[in-house]
Every structure is written in structure tokens, then in C-alpha cells.
């Protein structure tokens, strides 16, 4: 009996090892197959499991270039920036600078004057979980004004006017995706630390994690991908401005895997903060939200994920803390359907 048990244990060990090695090949096969069907959409994928990193990529930096996209190619991560911002908020919580249930009133710069109806109403966690009820930036109008750089027209003056002129929170406590919420979280971080958001994200995330290809203001680098709108037209990368905390960081698969590695390690500052962001702050019949994170649960798994869409690129990040894996998908075209379908296939068939 002992011998057969030993044999079974070895067999299980071997099958686990081969399964572990099998996952990257299966992910690569799926991504390759998708690229063959969609040769105009370049893609870079990073995957980490039990601290082991795997990468795959297809396509070229642009039509003229023969340089292949790889793990170091730069993309817009767009709204994935929001979970970097919420992680910084959670780091401030760990440092006892703020609490998630603090009202925003005392943490906004002086230019913001909340109407009486709004005072002691909106919590920091409300901003981070998209339920503040505040009006948002009118993106359709901004795109009309400047289809290449819509957020360029958003200034601190516009932001303070939107907030200061708000007299009522029509849907407070209900989910409504918000750019302004994360722009305000950036303002709160700046007030708390007495530094710019750019300086804060560098000091507390980019430098300590050595994410040397994660860029803020200056992203004019040789390994930058080209952004394409859904029709295939070329889009500019968004320039840095006040809305940065909501979606203006640029990065690559390698650095985002570095970030995932820190998130999955509860001993790091980023990992400790990530635990706070994973707590459920909003729940209805359609969704559960942490601080910026979408939370997907079934009987076997809890997944934490966040997608990003600029005018010309799509991305998604997802991780499973219990099973100790994380994945980042970066596309050089705005194509949220493709991004979502790829992640679903990977999660449902390969990482189940």
C-alpha cells in the first residue's frame, strides 16, 4: 500500500508540474490563433503563476516597422491606471494618513467647495467604487472637440466648476463608472502627500518595484506601439494631464507582471494595499466592486480584474490570489470585445 501511495504522490507531482508547464503553451496557442484571425491587431501578454513569468506577443510596433511587439513594448494601459491609483489610496490607509470611510471634504484642495447637500456625504471609498453620485466629465463632447486628445481640454478649473456647481447627488450609492471620481482621488493623494500624482506614483510604485518602462509624462520611446481606433485609424497616445489618475499611465507586459507579482505578495507595500482594495465596497445583482477592482466569483474561484480602453488601445488585468496567478493582456487597437473574449477563454478553459 505504501508503495502505491508513493507512486500516486509522484504521479500527482509530475502531473502538476506538466500542467504548470502546459499553461503558457496553451495561452500562447490561443493568442497565436487569435492573431492569425486578426492580423491587424498586435498583442502582448504577460502571465505569472507561483512567481514564474511567461510572455507571448504577436504583431509589429507599426505598419512600417519590422520590429516585433514583445514584453517590453509600450502600450496605454488606460483605465487600468485606476487600480494603481486605488492601490496608492490603500497605501495611504496602511500609513494611517486616511481611512477608506473618511469623507472627502477635508482631503480636497481648497479650490473645491462642496455644496451643503454634499457635505459629509461622499466617502473616499465611494469615489473608488464608482458610487459617489457626482456628475462626470462629458466624454462625448470632449471627443467631438478633440478626437485625438479629448482629455486635453480637462483642466483644474473645469474640474472644480463641475464639483462646486453640483447641488445634488442623484444616484449616490448606485454604480456609475466615473472618471471624475478617480481624478478626485488623485487630488486627495496630492493633498495628503504634498506632492504631485506623478511624483507619488513614482516614489511609491514605479521606483520601488523597478517598473522602469512604466511612464507618465514622457513616453516618446522607441519601443512604443501604435494605437488604432476600431476602424484601424491611427490614434495618438493620450498626453498627461489632471485626469492622469483615471487613465493616463503607459506600461508594458513585463512591468505589469512585476506589478502583479507585488500584488500577489502580501509582504510588499503594494501587496498589503491590494488586500484593502479587494474588500467588497459595492454590490448589486450585476456586480461586486472593491476599490476600482471588479470582483468575479464562482464556486471555485475569486478573480480580481480591471479593463482599460483608450481611443486606440484595449487592455485587461486579472489575478487570482488563492491560486497565485495573474495575467495582463495589451492590444494595440481599441477592441474591448476581443480583449474580453480572450480573457474569458483563458480563464474558462486554461486557468479553471
Please report, for each region that a protein language model flagged, where it lies by residue.
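Bacterial Sec-dependent N-terminal signal peptides
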Residues: 1-23
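Stable alpha-helical elements in mature extracytoplasmic
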Residues: 23, 27, 39, 54, ...
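Short beta-strand scaffold segments in enzyme catalytic cores
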Residues: 43-47, 294, 317
